[in-house]
């Protein structure tokens, strides 16, 4: 069975055309409705991040339980986990749109709302940024470590890691 993937020029062309259409759509969204575009970007990022984190959970569960049955399709969760660094970059870009997304990021609104003022130690921009950076750093380190273990298992053969 041949497992080599051959990427043709036509495939590359179609891929770049679709990426260009996506970029044009993103620019159009920012030009027409900034608030909706930031919200959609956040929602899409959370959706694909949840798939990647679910794959990381499944993958780590396989190592914790020393499961051998999943070895034949472990590349699928590895591929999904590869999205996490891209999600981190998108979240860093999202910092520019915090005021369009989160009500609590406006200090004048927090001062006038008793409930938001009570939650201010947790819901504030600096602490939010710190949390996001720390979460993504932990997730990226975890997934890189899991990937390293997977590659070591490939090079050693069998289940020598356990």
Residue ranges and their predicted role:
Residues 14-22, 45-52, 80-90, 127:
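Hydrophobic alpha-helical transmembrane segments of polytopic
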Residues 44-48, 60, 129-133:
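Hydrophobic alpha-helical transmembrane segments of multi-pass membrane proteins
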Residues 6-9, 13-28, 119-162:
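Long, contiguous internal "core" modules enriched in hydrophobic/ aromatic residues
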Residues 57, 76, 131:
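A residue-level signal for conserved active-site and pocket-lining positions in enzyme catalytic cores
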Residues 64-69, 73, 83-146, 150:
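Membrane-interface helix-loop-helix modules in multi-pass inner-membrane proteins
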Residues 16-35, 54-56, 94-100, 143-144:
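Alpha-helical transmembrane segments of multi-pass membrane proteins
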Residues 22-26, 48-70, 139-147:
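Central hydrophobic cores of alpha-helical transmembrane segments in multi-pass inner-membrane proteins
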Residues 1-5, 28-46, 68-71, 75, ...:
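Membrane-interface interhelical loops and short amphipathic "cap" helices
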């Amino acid at each position: 069975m041949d497992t080599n993937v051959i990427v043709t020029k036509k495939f590359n062309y179609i891929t770049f055309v679709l990426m260009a259409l996506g970029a044009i759509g993103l620019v159009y969204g920012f030009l027409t409705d900034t608030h909706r575009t930031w919200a959609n970007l956040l929602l899409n990022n959370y959706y694909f991040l949840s798939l990647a984190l679910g794959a990381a959970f499944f993958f780590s569960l396989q190592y914790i339980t020393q499961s051998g049955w999943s070895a034949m399709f472990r590349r699928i969760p590895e591929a999904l986990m590869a999205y996490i660094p891209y999600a981190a970059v998108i979240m860093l870009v999202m910092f520019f749109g915090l005021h369009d997304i989160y009500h609590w990021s406006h200090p004048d609104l927090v001062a006038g709302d008793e409930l938001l003022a009570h939650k201010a130690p947790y819901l504030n921009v600096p602490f939010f940024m710190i949390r996001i950076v720390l979460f993504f750093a932990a997730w990226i380190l975890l997934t890189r470590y899991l990937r390293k273990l997977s590659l070591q298992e490939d090079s050693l053969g069998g289940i020598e890691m356990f």
